[in-house]
Amino acid sequence: MPLPWISVIWFAYLIVIFVLIVVASVFIHVYQTPRDRSSFVTFICVFSIAALLATVMLLPVDVALVSSTISSALGQREEWATQEEVDKITYSLTIIYYSLYFLDALLCFVGIPFAYFWHEEYDEVAFEAGDQTACKRFWAATKYTLTFIAVVIALVLVGFFAPMMESQPGHDLGYWRGYLIENQGEHAFTFLLGFVTIIGSCLYAFYTPSGLAMLPALFLRKSSSFATQTLGGSTAMELNFNRERQRQLEGRCGGNSALLSAKDRRELDTLVREERTLIRRQRLIEGRQEEDQSWPVTVYSKLKTILRPFRLLGGFCLFLVGLSTWISLLMTVVDKLINSPCKHHCGYVLSRTNFNPISWIFIQSSRAFPTDYIIFALIVFFFFWGSVVGVVAVGIRFLWIRIFQIRKGHTSPQAMLLATAVLTLITLGLNYSIVMMLVPGYATFGPQTFCDLAPTSSEEQSDCSNHRHLVKPCSEKADSTAADKTCTPSVASTILNRVALNFPLFGALLLWAHFLFLAGGGRRRGRGRESVSKHQKKRQSYMRGCPIASREPATSNYERLFKEGFFIFKRR
């Protein structure tokens, strides 16, 4: 293979890794609380997120390397692409993939838990008094981390002794027979990878749909300065109405509240309490408006106003991207259910992938590297961003109980580590979703083609120079023997297909997890409309002058911000 082309491909991957480190660092810096930062926790979080995203971002490099062995125009291998050279490429990629997957599992099950317990064991008073040393703290964190290490060892042993997948009567695996694993060590590692991917896919189906549904709304919503002005006006209106209603009640009794009925006295007490709340809110709004008058904030606000049309366009584009990916995922899921030759017996693997719009775009763009890499990076960041928004909106939960809430500048190191663990597992689920569901055709063979013409001799390749109509795209299962000699599947698709084929239960669970993912987006949007309608009714009830003791004014993100600031101010 030409050395300059290899250098270009790997140089693009190094640039992507640098960008991933920057993205992970910015994410951790934005959400972590500045008052309780830990350099070790920050390093583990940044390194874990960057490592997981680097695993996903290796796919275009994989596709570019294996596709460079074939001339797509003629459907035959390049002169230098002997079987020995092709095996070297796939072997080196396999080592890199296994190393990254092993690193990902190590970070999820060892690195993040150890950092969590290391931070939990810190006692400032004991440390200053000299009673807590680094060795004691290290040993205490290691004792708790041993539980997670035991879980990993147990999973590896289960995979090591799990029975090997064999061909079943009536279900001839054919092409897929070469994907069956005979090595016990590789079988155990594949089981561990499949188990972690199952957990990640469940979290991916829970968090990511809600985040993807919210992304366009984040671009289309009003700016903060405009929302502050609107909130200030509505607060002043509610305060005037409140005081007018108090004057009406006081006018009935001539200033002596003892003459009022029990119902009117309760209403008057409620109005007095609400007046105090509205006055405090108004002061917070005025303080926020004074901050907005500083020149950096003014310049930023004007810049946001100028870029407002582009934000609207970006929100619309995000909506179209989300809709396109949803349709592509649905097409692949239905294709697996209907056209899989052995259904759940072999993990719903496909003999031939049907048309997929997103996969088709990637195949066409991959003919001009790194165009496909840029589009792929944008798609991955889109899903990762949606996952972050979903985790922030839902929080870290155990069943229905919220354990930690993720907020900008207010996330503790413990919550940051748990959020990182959730995002790393989600990224593993995202890796399977993109490779096997979103772009299966591109992820398997890319732009590879083969010449469907019988060669003149067994040692020569088929020549379609004068028969261009016989140049066909590669697929997982082709009727021509020339395809088996010419086409080389990517290493990423080979590893993930082995997970589904050697452990059919994993393949079935991963498929049905994507059904939950597809159903999750619409359900989240429906809940959002119901919540907005509820708040609108409460606000209308208040403005009609029917105070209710348990009433809440219509809430927005900025109102919540002001309330949180008020409670912090009150505690101080």
Curated annotation (Swiss-Prot):
GO MF term (any one): cobalamin binding
GO biological process: protein localization to vacuole
Family matches, as Pfam families: LMBR1 (PF04791)
Transmembrane segments: 8-28, 40-60, 95-115, 145-165, 188-208, 314-334, 374-394, 421-441, 499-519
Disordered: region residues: 522-544
Record localization: Lysosome membrane
Record flagged with keyword Aminoacyl-tRNA synthetase: no
InterPro entries per UniProt: LMBD1_LysCbl_Transport, LMBR1-like_membr_prot
Major subcellular location class: membrane
Mode of membrane association: Multi-pass membrane protein
Domain of life: Eukaryota
GO cellular component: vacuolar membrane
UniProt similarity note: Belongs to the LIMR family. LMBRD1 subfamily.
Task of the protein: Probable lysosomal cobalamin transporter. Required to export cobalamin from lysosomes allowing its conversion to cofactors.
Protein name: Probable lysosomal cobalamin transporter
Organism expressing this protein natively: Aspergillus fumigatus (strain ATCC MYA-4609 / CBS 101355 / FGSC A1100 / Af293) (Neosartorya fumigata)
